[in-house]
Amino acid sequence: DSIWIGSDRNIQTLNNLQRLLGSGRLANTGYVSILPVDQDIEHTAGASFAPNPIYFDPENIVRLAIEGGCNGVASTFGILGSIARKYAHKIPFVVKLNHNELLTYPNSYNQIMFGSVKEAWDMGAAAVGATIYFGSEESRRQLVEVSEAFEYAHELGMATILWCYLRNSEFKKDGVDYHAAADLTGQANHLGVT
């Protein structure tokens, strides 16, 4: 309680944060385990699920999260939307709003919106999530889009999760890849919480 009392978030947002923190095996421990499954869009379903074909069925993804004792499950509109009526009240949903797709060549590291905050709210999601590729040509647009989406999510009472990644070909110099450098990733995370 001492963490949330001073928050400027509305009561419904705090309620949904508590839904996430108070679910699963780690309930109310201060730790969170959310099963993230958006690889089917980011890396193709075949590459992601071929070793375990039962996960082509969205229901099995949610069952895995529940049986694994996760606090929540984060996935796409398609996966969560197809089973929302059966599971949204059993485990907190985090709907991923934007995605990159690998069919465009060359890959542009461009996260685009696949649905709306209102659609996620209507399917019973406790939270929405989004990715920003800091350093990419599209990162400024992504910042504006995600910021506006998260503002609306908070108005509706949803929690928000931001995934911060670095994507810039200039971060590779003389055979060294600096995408995982502490100063660069730290700056991306700092920008993400600002």
Residue ranges and their predicted role:
Residues 1-37:
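N-terminal basic, low-complexity leaders that serve as flexible interaction/assembly modules and, when applicable
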